[in-house]
């Protein structure tokens, strides 16, 4: 099996690992779990130093995003595109801003040569 090495920022690496951890908390199916564990393990192997000590912060944010998006999906399936659905959308928006801020903080802390940028008009 071919593996591509792609440069990413340290914040992006931690974010990706944390998303895989959240998937493992919520996923079922042996094959899916095996695939997610494999990807997570490959990424964790690439982590050096003490960067993994920041992983829980990303897991906390991404778990909240997962939970809010699940609530949105449930409401959409039920045809309930109401004020609560809009509130959930705003919550995802704010959580993603928090996630970006955490990635930027980690990138600055470890002097990552790759920096994620956002631009809104």
Which positions does each model-derived feature cover?
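Extended, charge-rich alpha-helical interface modules
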Residues: 1-121
